[in-house]
UniProtKB/Swiss-Prot annotation:
This is Aspartate carbamoyltransferase catalytic subunit. GO terms for molecular function: amino acid binding; aspartate carbamoyltransferase activity. One of its GO terms (biological process) is 'de novo' UMP biosynthetic process. PANTHER family: ASPARTATE CARBAMOYLTRANSFERASE, ORNITHINE CARBAMOYLTRANSFERASE, MITOCHONDRIAL. Heterododecamer (2C3:3R2) of six catalytic PyrB chains organized as two trimers (C3), and six regulatory PyrI chains organized as three dimers (R2). L-aspartate binds at residues 77, 159, 211. Belongs to the aspartate/ornithine carbamoyltransferase superfamily. ATCase family. Its EC number is 2.1.3.2. Keywords: Pyrimidine biosynthesis, Transferase. It catalyses: carbamoyl phosphate + L-aspartate = N-carbamoyl-L-aspartate + phosphate + H(+). The lineage of its organism: Bacteria, Bacillati, Bacillota, Bacilli, Bacillales. Pathway: Pyrimidine metabolism; UMP biosynthesis via de novo pathway; (S)-dihydroorotate from bicarbonate: step 2/3. GO terms for cellular component: cytosol. It comes from Listeria innocua serovar 6a (strain ATCC BAA-680 / CLIP 11262). Catalyzes the condensation of carbamoyl phosphate and aspartate to form carbamoyl aspartate and inorganic phosphate, the committed step in the de novo pyrimidine nucleotide biosynthesis pathway.
Amino acid sequence: MKNLLSMEALTVHEIEHLLEQAAQFKHGKKATLKEQAFAVNMFFEPSTRTHTSFEVAEKKLGVEVVSFDAATSSMTKGETLYDTLLTMEAVGVNVAVIRHSEENYYAGLDKLNIAIVNGGDGCGEHPSQSLLDLFTIKEQFGTFQDLKVAIAGDIRHSRVANSNMKVLKRLGAKLFFSGPKEWFDDSYLEYGTYLPVDEIVEKVDVMMLLRVQHERHSGTEQFTKASYHEKFGLTVERAAKLKQDAIIMHPSPVNRDVEIADSLVESEKSRIVTQMTNGVFIRMAILESILKEQEMRAKVCTY
């Protein structure tokens, strides 16, 4: 794997391999990188989980982390992302993890040799989050085939939803969507069925909630926190109707008592904290896969 830009770029075999490697890391597998490697985490949007878990993953692998602050970089002087990455490549950085507000920011960067891991591109995709979600689901159920998965909330503005709806259908899951119609697009019906939240909770094995992304809204939405929770959120009353073995997921950050009741965030059915933990192991698997391929290419070139 040279880069990780979108879930669509991964084959089912590659996905299964990454999930297996993540499971091995979780059960104590040690890193097997042979050469010194450097990574830079370039975040142009706020991030807690993605940024910190990539950094922890890098350090667990023995990868040196190069500091980068967009606000103090030469990009404030007009330097392009391409030229910034060209610089990183020139000084010996192997992989760049990038979070950017612009969708498809990585278009045109394929000429570079530095590997790119998409840490989220606007409302586009979030492949490492999608992979950790798959890892969490597989840990619980062992399979994706015929699982009923609900994706509920601010779907239109969610890069997580974009990644997950495509890959879950490809892996054999049955998808349901719910949330405000204003934040839904009929193009999603290619992947699943739209239903009101009260018609979904009793059906599904996985209740995947999405944050209300106020920063991406036009300001015309009419929901208060309380009214959103009442109409569309996972309330305590709705959660009581979930199947006995159903799980609750959320990519975080969580708006408590908006998309999910406060008391449910750390409840028995919740896998929200588990998702965060699993994020380190899946990101270790992603980085190891990329860096091992670089090692292999370098070895071939020396003969």
